[in-house]
Structures are given as structure tokens and as C-alpha cells.
């Protein structure tokens, strides 16, 4: 997530019942966990509205328990928030994105939205995966190519030109950068 104000990201597992799951356990489908991204951001530079814009636009939230060719509950679309005050803006963004999707005949958003129970850091080899050599061929998050416009209580802080670094017309990863 090469967005101004994003301090760090890490991938992990959340939403399930198993304590400290391994990747293989999560892939079994028996843990109940989803593969997730933890985002730490500077609220003075970037708003949760901007992060929600990125979230909705960079994958297909209408797919249930899958992203692209990756199938299973561990690949479900989910937002786990850790501050109850964030719930309203998340729901507002979901409603606005659903309306935008309906205009292009997409189905219902399947994204799970709930308070974060526990986050488990994934194995080191999963961290910053998209920055690793050759990862782009496999990346299967397929964007809908539908953009999230303003929505109730949104407070976008990033300028429009920031979003020019993303190509919403590609079928897989949308970040424009060198990664052979």
C-alpha cells in the first residue's frame, strides 16, 4: 500500500477461533480465520476514508469466500476494526460502494465487517509479499474497476493525483510499480 501516511502494513490472520494459527492451518479452512492486512496510518496525513477507498477498489468484494482463483473462507473479504467509532464510516462506505456496484450490475457485497477480536502475525515469508520478485503473476485480487466516490461522513485527505499511481483497468494487482 504505497499511500502517503501509511506507516506500515503486515499480513496475518483474524476472524477465527484458533490461537496463533499457521498458514497451513488457515488454508485448511478449519480455523475460521481470514488472511488479513493490518494497516497502521498517520491520521494527520491519511484518513480511514482513503483506506476504505483503497480497500473497496483493489478487490472484488462481491465474491464470497474467494478472491480470483483463491477459494475458501480464508480468502473472504473482511474488515476488522479495532475502534467502535470506525464502524459507522465503514458501513457508510460499504453502502456507497454497493450503490456504485449496482449501477454496473455487480451483486451484493459479501464483505464481513466486525470488531477485531485478535490479530495473529503471519509467517515472515508472507510479509511484503507483493514487493517480492515474481509475486505479481500470482496475485489474484481482481478489482471491479468501480470507483468509490464521496460518501456520508467521508473525509478524503489524499489528493486525486495519488490515485494516478493505481491502474484500475488491470485484472490483477493494481499498483503501478516495477516488480518483475
Task: Write out the residue ranges for each language-model feature.
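Flexible coil/turn and secondary-structure edge motifs
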Residues: 1-180
